[in-house]
């Protein structure tokens, strides 16, 4: 399977999790050779960034355990799915647009799960679903 399709499939899972399109950015987008990793970024609306509870983006990589855990987890998932050295990060929109002016290639256009001809998720509901609390589950009785 071509690496681009694998990267798009990974992007579909990221999109489902965060409710936003992820972007392929950096040197691997612009050059066929000379890159060391594949940068994938989710750019959240500034209000969504706040709702997720992330801290100041200038210090997030050193102080925000939730941000670090999500970046590590999605980087590992991306490496497993694509075989590429994925560097995944989450960024707030205003900050990202100010700091990074390079090309962005949208990912996540390959649906990751199908039932017949119909995707099992509704892209129109992704944004609200990504920020909704998980439903309460009944406690399990001891066996």
Predicted regions mapped to residue ranges:
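N-terminal regions immediately upstream of nucleotidyltransferase
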Residues: 1-5, 24, 32-35, 52-57, ...
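Helical scaffold of the NTase/Pol beta-like nucleotidyltransferase catalytic core
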Residues: 1-25, 63-84
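Active-site nucleotide-donor binding segment shared across nucleotidyl transfer reactions
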Residues: 10-55
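Arginine residue identity/basic-tract feature
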Residues: 15, 36, 41, 51, ...
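Acidic side chains
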Residues: 37-39, 87, 117
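Active-site ExK catalytic segment of metal-dependent nucleases
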Residues: 43, 57-59, 87-89
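Conserved catalytic core of two-metal-ion nucleotidyltransferases
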Residues: 64-113
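Ala/Thr-enriched low-complexity intrinsically disordered regions
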Residues: 136-138
